Amino acid sequence: MSNFDWFEESIKVLPTSHFVEVRDKKIHYLQWGESNKPGLLFIHGYSAHAHWWDFIAPAFVEDYSVVAIDLSGAGDSEHRDDYSQEIFADEIKAVCEDMCLDSVDVIAHSMGGSISLNATSIFPNFFKSLTLLDSIVILPPDKVRGFSNNKSMIRADFIYDDLESAKESFRLIPPQPCNNDYLLNHIAHHSFKEGKGGWVLKSDGKMKKTYKSKDLTDVLMSAPCPINIVYGLMSQIFTKEILDYTLYVGNIPEERIIGIPGTMHHLFVDDPLSVIDALRKLIGEN
């Protein structure tokens, strides 16, 4: 079976769509599989959404009740006046409670990783494990001042005449090549909504100005659950220096680390099947 045929089969496994209210805003999430199975929660990165996982989640439905959240300001969730890691932690908890999930394995990409790690310190009982996908949760002290997270590259104020024009404009942030155009097209299809005057990104452009984060060094050092790391060996974000520092501070054993050859920051768009294999191995050992 070709990768495209695999993708076509995967997205035939359709999720159900749900909403839960958190701090007066409707938070959207998707669910695949039987709800009485152990929970597996996917958390997207900045300016992404739950449908990024449409072709990943079905691989786990035999063993898990799989959930993917749209954090506020993203996807089909409502926008807020301001954002913080604590607000997102409340949203994660609310989705777990709405699905009656007592303890979940969490898989989080990019900014979703720092959000999830912080949530482990607030609601430790909800986390069975946390797998970080090319996610910077702490920085070496000499890198903090000069670090750029690319949030300024998001232009949520652009208006397009139609969905096709909007989809053609879609780019991965941070920029990187990707040979799997059908995956990008699927993600782009779910990244825009029709508004006044045309089609716009679903992502809230003001998040970059209001999002509040914090240093997570102490949280990583005392994480209440196993931490796994899956990263792109060609990642332009998650460098070897950051990996080594994260392993040192978190005292994370080497057997919980998997690098995916030939992939960059958006590793599960570059090579989804290898990422699925890595995730199965790591969460299966928890």
Regions found by a protein language model. Give the residues of each.
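Alpha/beta-hydrolase fold catalytic core
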Residues: 1-40, 62-64, 101-102, 256, ...
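Active-site loop/oxyanion-hole signature of alpha/beta-hydrolase fold enzymes
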Residues: 23, 67-107, 277
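Conserved loop-alpha-helix segment in the C-terminal half of the alpha/beta-hydrolase fold
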Residues: 222-263
